[in-house]
Every structure is written in structure tokens, then in C-alpha cells.
Amino acid sequence: MKRLKKLTREPGVFFRDYFNKKYPVRNIEQRINEIEEPAIIANSLHLAAVESAIHLSPFKIDVVFTWVDNSDTQWQQRHQQYCHAASPNNLYSNDETRFANHNELYYSLHSVRSFLPWVNHIYIITDSQTPKWFKSAEYPNVSIIDHSEIIDKQYLPTFNSHVIEAHLHNIPNLSEHFIYFNDDVFVARPLHREHFFHANGIASLFIADKSLQKMATKGTITPTLSASQNCIRLLNQRYDCNLDHPLVHTYVPLRKSGFQTAWQYYREEIKAFLPNKFRTNQDLNLATFLVPWLMYLDGKSIPNNDICYYFNIRSNKAPTQYLKLLQKNEDNQQPHSFCANDFHSEQQLYDYHAKLIAMLKDYFKI
């Protein structure tokens, strides 16, 4: 009877709810339907606010970006000199989308400064590059860190993000607690520090609802997938566990001590892949798999939800996500974050770069 009344009084709402239940929409890499997102976000914001009131002695939290400008001629020359080292057997290891610069860093950095005002310091790791728009006077709490400051010269130059990420803990003056960003990840709304690190220092672990085993069975073996599988083999040697999930494509809360532990346990295995100039199937991905899961296994992190909209900017489905994000921004129903990933698509969107930048400008009111 209630359903009949709803159908006659509010047919639009009735059919919306019916199709949402029958064909749930998922925007993220966790088992959460779009209709469930507002409640989960509201709950996470409430819990973070409650925990922030505990007033434990606050610890500093930094942010680390890795960034490359592939339009830089000097970088292109270095890249050309070594690109023969990229094996054709390692899928996408030297794909141009891996190094494409769409100026996302400007907007991602803006999202951090706008929505995470409690961040202590921001570090941008580059290969002898500085963003053209960067002026130190305008960004007093942002430092540019060159690869040579954190990576042994015998491994330079490197175009392998796994190698770069293996050395994040070497950043001078980096705080024990930090959040790692790729430049295609954006904070979508104001967030408490407790969303990333609990007041007692325990980190959040944003686990994707994906199976690495199933991904491998499909036959598309990428260096990222291989690196995760390599990490699992190492962790299984020391821990009695059954890991099969990657992390959500969003920011990653990390601790320097987690990297130090990884290097202590697996130094020889890490050093073995550092000479790889480009991603290979023999790599380890420390920042986005080995260290976060090592922290979890050592009781230094716990699973948490992050509603992160994840999409391919080259896909013809991207504009739908842009409209959805802009509408949710207007309605104050924003996700925690979103990732504007760049990889090849069979049905490639025309002028995808311009459409992305237009959305970012509109979303962040720049």
C-alpha cells in the first residue's frame, strides 16, 4: 500500500528508488552504491569530528606529491636517451599517458590547501623541474624536492614511479605522518585530519573492492599489478595472511617508520629493482601497497572508507562524471575525493584535456 501511494503521489521518486535498488550505480572502487554515499560520508565526518574533540597531543601531518612535466625539453632528452630500456613486455611502462602533464597539480595542490588547512608542509618531488606557475612567495609551506635529494645517484635518472616512491621517506624534514598524492587525485571537500590519521596515530587504509587474483586471471598483467603480487609474496614470507586487494585510487596515509621497516625487512629485494629506469614486472610498489599493508599487519593502520570517484579522463563517460561531481558540489553532497586518471580508451573523448580543466576550474571556483 505504501508503495502504491508513493507511485501515485511521487512517481518520479518511486521509479528513481526502484531503479537505484534494481540497478545500483557505483562511482567508486568500494562496495558502496551511490544512494548509500551520503550516509557513509556524513557518518565518517561525524566520527572524525568526535575524535578531534579528544584533544590528544597533535602531531604534524605533511603531504607529498610526485610530479613530472613531459613537455620539458630537457626531460624529453633524458627520457629519449633511456627509453630503449623500456621493455615491450611490460605493458604501459613507457606509455605517454604515464608522463602526461595536464596541469592537474595546480588544482590538486589547491584542493589540499583549501580543504586540508591543517597540513603542516607540502613537498613536490620532481626531476629537475618546477611548475611554471609556482612562486615560492605564494606557496610558503610548499617545497620542491629534486630526485637527487632522495635517491642515490647510481639510480638516476629514473622514469620509474615505483623507484621514486621507494624513497619518499628520505625527503629532508618530512614528518613521521604524511599523505601521499599523485597529481591526478583531488580532495573534494573539507576533511578532518582524523579521516587520514586517528588521534592516536593509527593510519587509515582505503581498500578497494577488487581482487588482484581476478585481475591477473583476466590476462592484463601490468607492472602495477605485478608489483602488488611481488609485494604479496614478500609479505607472505613474514606474515600469515591472505592479501588480495589493492588500495583505492586516492591519497595514501603513510608513516616514515613504515618505509624504514620495509627497507629493514626487504632491503635486498628493494635494491634489486631500483636500476629499472621504467616500470617492469619485477618492481615493488612501496607507497601504494607494500608499506600500507605492512603498516596494517603491524597494527599501524585500520581499514576506512573513502568515497573516491574514479574515472578515465579519455573515456567518453568522463563528462557524465564531471556533471555528477559539479552537481554534488552544488548540493553539498561531495565525495571525499576524486581521481581523474589518464589512460588510453577505445572510445576516446575528443578534447578530453580541455574538458577536464573546465570541470576543475568550475569545481574549485578558480
Curated annotation (Swiss-Prot):
Enzyme Commission number(s) from the entry: 2.7.-.-
Superkingdom per UniProt: Bacteria
GO biological process: polysaccharide biosynthetic process
Transmembrane annotation, as ranges: none
InterPro entries: Stealth (IPR047141), Stealth_CR1 (IPR031358), Stealth_CR2 (IPR021520)
Coiled-coil boundaries: none
UniProt KW keywords: Exopolysaccharide synthesis, Transferase
EC class name: transferase
GO terms of molecular function: transferase activity, transferring phosphorus-containing groups
Keyword Disulfide bond: no
A Pfam family per the record: Stealth_CR2
Similarity annotation: Belongs to the stealth family.
Miscellaneous remark of the record: Stealth proteins are part of a protein family that is conserved from bacteria to higher eukaryotes. Family members were first identified in microbes as proteins that help pathogens to elude the host innate immune system. Microbial stealth proteins are involved in the biosynthesis of exopolysaccharides. Stealth proteins are predicted to function as hexose-1-phosphoryltransferases.
Name of the molecule in the record: Capsular polysaccharide phosphotransferase LcbA
Organism per entry: Neisseria meningitidis
